[in-house]
């Protein structure tokens, strides 16, 4: 049985209540899907009852010809949250909303379960395997798994609507055009537009999160208070901090930018690079686990990666891939009665490959040299 503990009141985390409802490319920038399996399944689910901003070559799925258009798209975070709930309930997953995980209960390095705080008070939920999908390794850290804090720039946005956008939406019959993003800080992931002299936010403790939220919200108020009224309005602020690289584990393996085009025997899947065409990485299983912690595993933004490797691994498509791998690994660990770090890698790879995941990239996809058009930053990604 599976119990999903959700601290918010909707599913999806940063991709939904966090308003980062944007798929970076799943493709190599040449017309080929690289990130497959559950990532493709959830991409289709997110667009089933939603607007999209797919380029023409990707409107009907993977094109039958080479293209430099990339497969990125915005989607409705609200509808995706609802669709995720329907999917999980249909699969028999038990979901507990508004359940704040306070602490893991440890016996040495073995997790007996977690304590949650909710409207009915404090409760204990036992577990055989625990997957930390918090995005900031909060459970892993409290359990004693070594972690590294990340840095985040002055970036924060909400969602609003304008009458001008509504007119365009009516004319083009496209509701997406009605929306706009009001910003607090507007720095990008490389630190461009970071205010001079302002240091990045380090980690994700309570003080840092409050500093980040309050500074950004006040900056947004300064920017928007003279604009909002009868013709323009902010209708949603993010429900969680929009911290991309808050904290990650120091796992049995660490993905870095130097791993580009390197094969890995313990790969759980091939991923692409949202800022560069062609670049490929095989994700080692070890980025999700740490020896000695026999029933703890993580995924998504808190997987073990550093430098550019962390940026490549943290975004939605690779996060889905590592989440899929973590779930399968948890089931294998229980079925095989082995520590989570020691699951048979061949069985894990086969289970992933059976869903379409590309475990090892084809060497023919590797260019002999960096192409002139290799840099292809996703236009809407921050």
Describe the residue ranges of each PLM region:
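N-terminal glycine-rich phosphate/pyrophosphate-binding loop and immediately adjacent elements
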Residues: 87-94, 115, 132-135
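Flavin (FAD/FMN)-binding glycine-rich loop and adjacent Rossmann-like elements that form
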Residues: 14-16, 38, 42, 61, ...
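N-terminal Rossmann-like FAD-binding beta1-loop-alpha1 element of flavoenzymes
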Residues: 1-4
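Conserved N-terminal/central alpha/beta ligand/cofactor-binding core
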Residues: 7-103, 107, 148, 157-158, ...
